[in-house]
């Protein structure tokens, strides 16, 4: 699996250990759902202004958020593994928001970025949290991904 990382922000330094961590999170997320080792995901680190403009343009919500996902097959049923496109889509994470949330929730910045990466990966795979039941399923999968990597609160 390829994780193509693009850092478009300058506020927070992106260290090699963070790059390895997010790559591992994406790989475990996709493997746990039976996706091909040939699958690719784009991961883009941005600042609050950038993610705010994306959120306004694509969701009609004019405020910053922590993570957005853009699946290439948005609104379509996920194809069978052998029919799947190699590139699944992009995950966009605001690192300044992740840093604030880590402090607010009392855990590390890396743990927060790992969680947001798992959350975004699951959105690319068709999961959502529009209902309480869907939210619980998604949260269970997110925590399972982090546990497999030994990432705890």
Curated annotation (Swiss-Prot):
Matching Pfam families: YbeY
Any one GO MF annotation of this record: RNA endonuclease activity
Record bears the keyword NAD: no
Keywords: Cytoplasm, Endonuclease, Hydrolase, Metal-binding, Nuclease, Ribosome biogenesis, rRNA processing, Zinc
Enzyme Commission number(s) from the entry: 3.1.-.-
Catalytic EC class: hydrolase
One GO-annotated biological process of the protein: rRNA processing
Cofactor note: Binds 1 zinc ion.
Cofactor(s) for this UniProt protein: Zn(2+)
InterPro entries: MetalPrtase_cat_dom_sf_prd (IPR023091), YbeY (IPR002036), YbeY_CS (IPR020549)
Location within or outside the cell: Cytoplasm
Main location: cytoplasm
GO cellular component: cytoplasm
Annotated residues for binding of Zn(2+): 119, 123, 129
Domain of life: Bacteria
Similarity-based family: Belongs to the endoribonuclease YbeY family.
Functional description taken from the UniProt entry: Single strand-specific metallo-endoribonuclease involved in late-stage 70S ribosome quality control and in maturation of the 3' terminus of the 16S rRNA.
HAMAP family: Endoribonucl_YbeY
Annotated protein name in UniProt: Endoribonuclease YbeY
Organism: Desulforamulus reducens (strain ATCC BAA-1160 / DSM 100696 / MI-1) (Desulfotomaculum reducens)
Lineage of the species this protein comes from: Bacteria, Bacillati, Bacillota, Clostridia, Eubacteriales
């Amino acid at each position: 699996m390829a994780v193509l990382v693009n850092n478009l922000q300058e506020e927070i330094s992106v260290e090699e250990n963070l790059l390895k961590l997010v790559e591992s999170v994406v790989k475990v997320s996709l493997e746990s759902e039976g996706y091909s080792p040939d699958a690719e995901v784009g991961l883009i680190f941005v600042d609050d202004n950038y993610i705010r403009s994306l959120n306004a343009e694509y969701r009609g919500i004019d405020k910053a958020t922590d993570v957005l996902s853009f699946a290439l097959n948005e609104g379509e049923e996920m194809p069978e593994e052998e029919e799947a496109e190699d590139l699944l889509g992009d995950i966009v994470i605001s690192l300044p928001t992740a840093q604030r949330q880590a402090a607010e929730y009392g855990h590390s910045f890396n743990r927060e970025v790992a969680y947001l990466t798992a959350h975004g990966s699951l959105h690319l795979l068709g999961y959502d949290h529009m209902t309480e039941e869907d939210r619980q399923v998604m949260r269970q999968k997110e925590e399972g991904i982090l546990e497999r990597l030994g990432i705890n609160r």
